[in-house]
């Protein structure tokens, strides 16, 4: 599931056509029947179409390319020699096991070498990977790898904290439990002081 290369759109669809919208609506009607509902009652008549449109919006990450987002960089850092840190980047995703929401925040730092990127691009990278079926571990690694590949910084740090509705709504039903994952590259992997500085800023109250 996670063999999508950094910077590419979904290779699974290469040369393939997506099923038509009507087939998706029909599948959702079948699902409504399967759970014991009547898709012909007034409140559900338009639900299959609404659900299909909603999921089209929720999974836009399959249609976006990190390479395009990070393709424009600035090569003049004007003497800046410190990390760029963005915290509290809210996101939603869906777990690939149950297709149930994951809701959380991403905290990201990179140590520029010769390239910097607009701050909104970092947020868009998070959106690309979060708006796919995911595991939190894979998403953390994908964001870090994308920044390392395209910005070629001295170091990258990514920390994601999220609540998984598959643990909240079903199974063990532990409301409020959060999962934390990290990925450190370059100077952030080798330098414990830099890593500790990143963690301190992430944990500092706004």
From Swiss-Prot:
| GO CC term, one of those recorded | cytoplasm
Superkingdom as given in the UniProt entry? Bacteria
Q: What is its EC number?
A: 3.5.4.16
GO biological process terms, alphabetically, are: one-carbon metabolic process; tetrahydrobiopterin biosynthetic process; tetrahydrofolate biosynthetic process
- Which residues take part in binding Zn(2+)? 95, 98, 166
**Family matches, as Gene3D superfamilies:** 1.10.286.10, 3.30.1130.10
Record's Pfam families?
Answer: GTP_cyclohydroI
Q: Which UniProt keywords are listed?
A: GTP-binding, Hydrolase, Metal-binding, Nucleotide-binding, One-carbon metabolism, Zinc
InterPro entries, alphabetically? GTP-CH-I_C/QueF (IPR043133), GTP-CH-I_N (IPR043134), GTP_CycHdrlase_I (IPR001474), GTP_CycHdrlase_I_CS (IPR018234), GTP_CycHdrlase_I_dom (IPR020602)
Pathway membership, UniProt = Cofactor biosynthesis; 7,8-dihydroneopterin triphosphate biosynthesis; 7,8-dihydroneopterin triphosphate from GTP: step 1/1
* Sample GO molecular function, one term: GTP cyclohydrolase I activity
Tell me what reaction this enzyme catalyses: GTP + H2O = 7,8-dihydroneopterin 3'-triphosphate + formate + H(+)
Q: Which NCBIfam families match?
A: folE (TIGR00063), PRK09347.1-2 (NF006825), PRK09347.1-3 (NF006826)
Family according to the record: Belongs to the GTP cyclohydrolase I family.
What is this protein's name?
A: GTP cyclohydrolase 1
Give the lineage. Bacteria, Pseudomonadati, Pseudomonadota, Alphaproteobacteria, Hyphomicrobiales
């Amino acid at each position: 599931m996670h063999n999508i290369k950094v910077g590419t759109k979904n290779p699974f669809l290469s040369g393939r056509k997506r099923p038509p919208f009507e087939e998706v609506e029909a599948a959702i009607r079948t699902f409504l029947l399967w759970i014991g509902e009547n898709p012909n009652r007034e409140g559900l008549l338009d639900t299959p179409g609404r659900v299909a449109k909603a999921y089209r919006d929720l999974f836009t990450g399959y249609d976006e390319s990190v390479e395009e987002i990070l393709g424009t960089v600035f090569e003049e850092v004007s003497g800046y020699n410190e990390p760029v840190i963005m915290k509290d980047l809210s996101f939603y995703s869906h777990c690939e096991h149950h297709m149930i929401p994951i809701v959380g925040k991403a905290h990201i730092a990179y140590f520029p070498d010769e390239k910097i990127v607009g701050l909104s691009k970092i947020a868009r990278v998070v959106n690309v990977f979060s708006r796919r079926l995911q595991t939190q571990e894979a998403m953390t690694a994908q964001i870090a790898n994308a920044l390392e590949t395209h910005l070629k910084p001295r170091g990258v740090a990514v920390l994601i904290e999220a609540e998984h509705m598959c643990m909240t709504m079903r199974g063990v039903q532990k409301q409020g439990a959060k999962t934390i994952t990290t990925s450190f590259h370059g100077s952030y992997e080798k330098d414990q002081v830099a890593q500790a500085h990143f963690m301190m800023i992430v944990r500092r109250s706004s």
